[in-house]
A protein has these predicted regions:
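N-terminal Sec-pathway targeting helices
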Residues: 1-26
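N-terminal non-globular leader segments, chiefly Sec-dependent signal peptides
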Residues: 10, 23-36, 145
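Short, non-transmembrane alpha-helical segments in secretory-pathway proteins
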Residues: 31-64, 104-117, 171
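Exposed beta-strand-loop-beta-strand "reactive/processing" segments of non-cytosolic proteins
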Residues: 58-85
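Short, ordered beta-strand-loop transition motifs
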Residues: 67-68, 87, 144-149
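Intrinsically disordered, low-complexity regulatory segments enriched in Ser/Thr/Pro
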Residues: 83-95, 188-190
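Non-cytosolic head/periplasmic domains of membrane-anchored proteins
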Residues: 93-171
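Extracytoplasmic/periplasmic C-terminal soluble domains
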Residues: 139-242
Length: 242
């Protein structure tokens, strides 16, 4: 072996010793995580990362994954994004657009509800996930339009009005929405004044118990421009004890 070859061999061996020593120190300082933790971490990221990437690409950098794997909006701090995987399109669909248009949708729908119920509170949230071709430029009126995948918009209407006229109220609401060509899932709850006043505009579903013991009557229906369907039997109304 030449002197140059011996020199290279010495350098290689020294480097190998240094790398092994460094690796030993690293293992001592940072021992490998238990296998079950590595598996849990892999499953967490394999479940949440594709959803985050989809949402960020579509709407912008305003989402985070929680420790439980849910996707939360940083713009609407109390909102968790609901997504579904479409096998046909090989992509996700979501309800986030409804929240982006929440204020505009409520500005359209609240005046209609007030003409029928008088004093009332109306909140908008998503129902069906929107088609993949809907984007952040989709308008409120497009969300209210008829679609095979819809309805996309769901509303909760709370009112302290006397429920004796509930059938007439629902008929008027149906006619008003049908006249505009809206496709909506509508929930109506007649409450006592005390319960009604406790309903908060934000995060009301978590802050107020509006179960059977809190409402007087509760009805749900899907209203389309040319059809009406009760979601709770033929009569459609559930009587509470509130």
């Amino acid at each position: 072996m030449t002197k140059r070859g011996k020199g290279r061999l010495v350098i290689f061996l020294c480097a190998a010793v240094i790398l092994v020593a460094a690796g030993s120190v690293r293992v001592k300082l940072h021992p490998p995580r238990p296998l079950h933790e590595q598996i849990a971490d892999y499953m967490y990221h394999s479940r949440t990362d594709p959803k985050l990437e989809y949402l960020i690409e579509k709407y912008g950098d305003e989402f985070v994954a929680t420790e439980y794997g849910s996707i939360q909006s940083t713009r609407f701090s109390d909102f968790y994004v609901y997504l579904e995987w479409s096998e046909a399109e090989q992509t996700y669909t979501d309800t986030y657009l409804v929240y982006l248009r929440k204020e505009e949708l409520e500005s359209i729908l609240v005046p209609i509800a007030e003409t029928i119920f008088g004093e009332c509170k109306l909140f908008v949230y998503g129902y069906s996930t929107c088609p993949s071709n809907f984007g952040k430029d989709t308008t409120a009126l497009e969300l209210l339009s008829v679609s095979e995948e819809g309805p996309f918009v769901q509303i909760d209407i709370f009112t302290p009005k006397d429920p004796k006229q509930r059938n007439e109220d629902m008929q008027k609401l149906t006619e008003a929405f049908q006249e505009q060509g809206y496709f909506i899932y509508a929930n109506i709850k007649y409450l006592s004044s005390e319960t009604y006043n406790a309903v908060e505009e934000t995060d009301y579903r978590h802050g107020v118990n509006i179960g059977r013991d809190a409402y007087k009557y509760f009805g749900s229906a899907i209203i389309a421009p040319d059809s009406f369907e009760w979601m709770r039997g033929d009569d459609g109304w559930c009587e509470g004890t509130g």
